[in-house]
């Protein structure tokens, strides 16, 4: 598209002595046009073109302006034409946001406005005068203007045909390269490559029915490979079955078109069956081999190879689906990279621990979130879990990455069950008699226990994860290996044994006159405190959003976060429109007035309101604890 040349500056509302409006007529980008002083609301300049032209596109380089508008007019009305003689060519367009204007960042943004961005009625006419209006209402610290402006006319048909004809003969120094193909006028990216493939395929197949037959065999081979990928696993070291000689060239051309993702997925899929072979027991191996010979497609369809073959970039967002992560102890930029990788794998992110959170990714122990989640019974893992899942492109069991101090087998095996179902095929028959194993494990050897707060309160990520966790609990009890590591079960057993040993002691002495009645009531009628379920916390802060402002003495900030989270409240990291209550230990601040102007429903309260609600175990009126401006 040819560039429209500018003749001179007709008028200018404001210009600097150094950065004058005539700089827009020059091609150098470092020559700018700026206002005479800072703080001007709008500035404008009128430029005269060489002749009447139809404007096809506009290129504008900014220099601190927030908005730019382009109008067009005709010099037939005289140099002192009014505003009514100008028509809008480009509506007011934004070049800097309010935050960028106040901070002074990105002042030299360049935008190209094509014919689809211009007003059609004005772009179809011919003009010889252009008026540019710039404004900056957000910043009054520095002058603003434009770096450059360029106008382009629509390309001519003769020039387009001339350029298309010049493509056929190209001169490189003293040599001239001539195209042999007659269809060189309509060259497209990749056209020569595909024409070469068509030539080789037509030369190899003489009959005209060849391409349709090759397409049919291609569809049949792709359907067979997607239905049963068994030969890839069996003959991992050998080459795949050779096609007929007549179609070999066609298959070679198709292999060139295959994406490089399948060869990269090959080594990972070949290594995984080797890991599952030693886990088979000698008794289960001979029983499984006849079943594999009889029905070769079914067990391999349930194994690792189809899942490994399907695992690719298109399923990357489903690897950690249903997982809600919270980060603790990391600093930027690694914190943002770790969060982006978790979100890329399909997980959800929370800034603080919420009831729907499933994993706390901690850099080191003894952080405030670490202590909070450890007290609530959550799962705390290292950062390597997310990094390895992202690197391996599959979900790994989180129990391998648990931080020190957590030994809950039922929670740890929840992930291992879902992963073992994907990784190890021989374990599937062992998990089918699940109800029997659960009833046997719940026999006299293991006394019944009430549900813990984790089982009653913590919501499960999904129905599938819940069933997987129960299945792994029953399997862990059958094996008996993980039962010793369950700290809560051991504490309950020890407490119950102590209660069973304590009643006979006063009866043997016989000196306590109140021993008989209290023992009978304790053993037969009232249950012990250890058998009672832990009461659930009230959720009177549900649906309320809090923001902690200012400094708090000692560990008061940690206590406030703990109470708000315990009563199902939401804590915001920064001030936004969702905040309803601002908790502060300071007096009235001038910033509170600005916040009230933007959000009149805000309430500024003392920390004592949170403590009083905790003592009364109900929601108290916050007006009694409000922060008001001093007279």
From Swiss-Prot:
Post-translational modification, as annotated: Phosphorylation of Ser-371 causes dimer dissociation. Phosphorylation by CK2 promotes interaction with APTX and APLF. Sumoylated.
In-chain residues carrying the UniProt-annotated modification Phosphothreonine: 200, 281, 452, 456, 487, 518, 522
Keywords: Chromosome, DNA damage, DNA repair, Isopeptide bond, Nucleus, Phosphoprotein, Repeat, Ubl conjugation
One of the GO BP terms on file: telomeric DNA-containing double minutes formation
Principal location class: nucleus
Disordered, as annotated region: 225-315, 405-537
Disulphide-bridged cysteine pairs: none
Name this polypeptide is given: DNA repair protein XRCC1
Organism encoding this protein: Mus musculus (Mouse)
């Amino acid at each position: 598209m040819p560039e429209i040349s500018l003749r001179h500056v007709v008028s200018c509302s404001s210009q600097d002595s150094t950065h004058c409006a005539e700089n827009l007529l020059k091609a150098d980008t470092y020559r700018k046009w700026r206002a005479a002083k800072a703080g001007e609301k709008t500035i404008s300049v009128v430029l005269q073109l060489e002749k009447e032209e139809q404007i096809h596109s506009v290129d504008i380089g900014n220099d601190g302006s927030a908005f730019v508008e382009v109008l067009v007019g005709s010099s037939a009305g005289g140099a002192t034409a009014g505003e009514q003689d100008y028509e809008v060519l480009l509506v007011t367009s934004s070049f800097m946001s309010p935050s960028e204007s106040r901070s002074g960042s990105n002042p030299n943004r360049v935008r190209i406005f094509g014919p689809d961005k211009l007003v059609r009625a004005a772009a179809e006419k011919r003009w010889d005068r252009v008026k540019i209006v710039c404004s900056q209402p957000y910043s009054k610290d520095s002058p603003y203007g434009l770096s450059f402006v360029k106008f382009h006319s629509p390309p001519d048909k003769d020039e387009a045909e001339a350029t298309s004809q010049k493509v056929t003969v190209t001169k490189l120094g003293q040599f001239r390269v001539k195209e042999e193909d007659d269809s060189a006028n309509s060259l497209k990216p990749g056209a020569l490559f595909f024409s070469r493939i068509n030539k080789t395929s037509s030369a190899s197949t003489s009959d005209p029915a060849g391409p349709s037959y090759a397409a049919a065999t291609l569809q049949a081979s792709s359907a067979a490979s997607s239905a049963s990928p068994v030969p890839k696993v069996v003959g991992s070291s050998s080459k795949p079955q050779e096609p007929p000689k007549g179609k070999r060239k066609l298959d070679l051309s198709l292999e060139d078109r295959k994406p490089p993702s399948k060869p990269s997925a090959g080594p990972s899929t070949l290594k995984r069956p080797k890991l599952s072979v030693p886990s088979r027991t000698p008794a289960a191996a001979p029983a499984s081999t006849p079943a594999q010979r009889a029905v070769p497609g079914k067990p391999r369809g349930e194994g690792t190879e189809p899942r490994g073959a399907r695992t690719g970039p298109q399923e990357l967002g489903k690897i950690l689906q249903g997982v809600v992560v919270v980060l603790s102890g990391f600093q930027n930029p690694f914190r943002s990279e770790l969060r982006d990788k978790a979100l890329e794998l399909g997980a959800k992110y929370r800034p603080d621990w919420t009831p729907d959170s499933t994993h706390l990714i901690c850099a080191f122990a003894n952080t405030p979130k670490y202590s909070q989640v450890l007290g609530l019974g959550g799962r705390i893992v290292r950062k390597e879990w997310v990094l390895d899942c992202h690197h391996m492109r599959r979900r790994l069991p989180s129990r391998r990455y648990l931080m020190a101090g957590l030994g809950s087998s039922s929670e740890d095996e929840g992930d291992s069950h879902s992963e073992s179902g994907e990784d190890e095929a021989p374990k599937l028959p062992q998990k089918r008699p699940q109800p029997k194993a659960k009833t046997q494990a719940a026999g006299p050897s293991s006394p019944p226990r009430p549900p813990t707060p984790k089982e009653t309160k913590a919501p499960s990520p999904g129905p599938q994860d819940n069933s997987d966790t129960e299945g792994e609990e029953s399997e862990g009890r059958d094996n008996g290996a993980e039962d010793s590591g369950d700290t809560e079960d051991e504490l309950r057993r020890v407490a119950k044994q102590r209660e069973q040993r304590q009643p006979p002691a006063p009866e043997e002495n016989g000196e306590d006159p109140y021993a008989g009645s209290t023992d009978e009531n304790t053993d037969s009628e009232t249950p012990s405190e250890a058998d009672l379920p832990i009461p659930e916390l009230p959720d009177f802060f549900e649906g309320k959003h809090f923001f902690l402002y200012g400094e708090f003495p000692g560990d008061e900030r940690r206590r406030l976060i703990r109470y708000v989270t315990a009563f199902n409240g939401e804590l915001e990291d920064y001030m936004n429109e969702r905040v309803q209550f601002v908790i502060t230990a300071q007096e009235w601040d001038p910033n509170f007035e600005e916040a009230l102007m933007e959000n009149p429903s805000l309430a500024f309260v003392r920390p004592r309101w949170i403590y009083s609600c905790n003592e009364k175990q109900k929601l108290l009126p916050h007006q009694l604890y409000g922060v008001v401006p001093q007279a």
